[in-house]
Structures are given as structure tokens and as C-alpha cells.
């Protein structure tokens, strides 16, 4: 929010410092990207975010009102690094981000699976059948 020197960014950040609603990829049945149905948009509003759409740019210096998030901001919320690219079209990019499984969660699951497989191989020997008990230990 502060990248364009928005003078209210610090105050906004204090209000927005809570868990955000789930991002959803949107529907092709209606217009461009928004942050979900009415209940979700109301939850975003409590955080100080206008959920009726996605901004092209962060708020400017003297912006007055409730800001919208950009595609990059939404990607950060979902756990994507800043070097991740989504293409140029805002709606398509938002759908990819909203429908994505968050990368940090995918990484944690992958690491746990690897740990289970390595443990199973050490315990049972290579190629032996795995027990579900290994996963839930």
C-alpha cells in the first residue's frame, strides 16, 4: 500500500493487520475480478479494503478512501514471491491467484511427504509397502 507513498498507509496497515478472508478465483459468469460474494467483501471492508474490484496500482500519495488491492498484493497474501509472474491480464491473473493452492502450504505438505517416505524407507526397506501410520504420527 505504501509503494506510491500513500500518506495513510501506516494507519491502514494497523487496521488491516488481521487474517484476511479466503481468496477465490471468481466466476466467468460476471464481470472482472472482485474479492468474493457480499459476506467476503464485507469482511474485507472491516480490514480497510474495497473488495468490489482489484486495483491497477497502489493508492497515490493523497488518496482518500478505502483502497483496493492490486494483483501483486493479492499474490503476496496467497504466499507467492514477488518474482512470480501471472501474465498481463488482471482478471486472468486474479483467477490464477485466487484458485491457487498457496505455495507455502504446498511446500510444507511436500516436505512432510518426503519426510514420511524417507522414514518409511529407513524403517521398512526400499520398495516395501508404506503404512498410513507413518503419515499420521
Regions found by a protein language model. Give the residues of each.
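C-terminal target-recognition/interaction regions appended to catalytic cores
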Residues: 1-137
Amino acid at each position: 500500500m505504501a509503494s506510491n507513498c500513500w500518506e495513510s498507509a501506516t494507519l491502514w496497515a494497523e487496521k488491516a493487520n488481521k487474517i484476511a478472508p479466503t481468496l477465490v478465483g471468481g466466476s466467468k459468469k460476471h464481470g472482472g475480478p472482485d474479492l468474493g460474494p457480499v459476506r467476503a467483501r464485507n469482511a474485507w471492508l472491516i480490514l480497510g479494503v474495497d473488495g468490489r474490484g482489484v486495483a491497477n496500482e497502489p493508492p497515490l500519495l493523497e488518496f482518500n478512501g478505502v483502497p483496493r488491492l492490486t494483483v501483486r498484493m493479492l499474490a503476496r497474501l496467497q504466499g507467492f514471491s514477488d518474482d512470480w509472474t501471472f501474465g498481463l491480464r488482471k482478471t486472468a491473473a486474479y483467477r490464477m491467484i485466487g484458485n491457487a493452492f498457496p505455495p507455502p502450504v504446498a511446500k510444507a505438505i511436500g516436505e512432510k511427504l518426503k519426510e514420511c517416505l524417507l522414514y518409511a524407507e529407513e524403517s521398512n526397506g526400499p520398495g516395501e509397502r508404506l503404512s498410513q501410520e507413518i503419515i499420521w504420527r
